[in-house]
Amino acid sequence: TEKIREGGVMYSDYALGQFFEEASKKPWFEKTLFVIVADHGSGAENELLRTSPYSHTVPILFYMPSAGLKGITDQTMSHLDIMPTLLPMLGVNDSYVAFGHDAFDPSSPHFAVGYYDGTYGIVDGDLFYQFSERGLESLFNLKADPHKKIDIKERADPAKVHLFEAYIQQYYRTVAERAFTPESWGKEVAQ
């Protein structure tokens, strides 16, 4: 399996190289914003990397040749943050519905939400919250306890728990009501 994984990485590297070699010859290349991201982790040989939330850790790359964007960050973000990050980069200021945040806005909260092992998991800095329909099930400090052996749920910040529960509830409401556009929110929310 390690050889298969290595082959997949080598192929991806080759394919991206070929793509960018051809794309760089096109007139639209310089002003195009490219987003490169995986949809899941690699299933690495490391046991820890096969558990949540690590199994969903992937890099994301924003590349626009004419923008001169440079830098690396290890801040928490997720696929949900891609659209809210791209729109300001592209100069779009219209209203939109999104459950993510602008990764480059320091005033935005930076947490990632995923569905792991039958629970909603939220990574917020070093903390990993796990929620079920009953509420907060567990809380781990990933930096101090990467193998998630010590549940520190009793030390959870009630304001954060409330925020994350509201986030999950709003997600369900939006999906159930198919409220994906500002027009579908109702006048009191859209303004």
Model-flagged regions — what are they?
Residues 1-191:
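Solvent-exposed soluble domains appended to multi-pass membrane proteins
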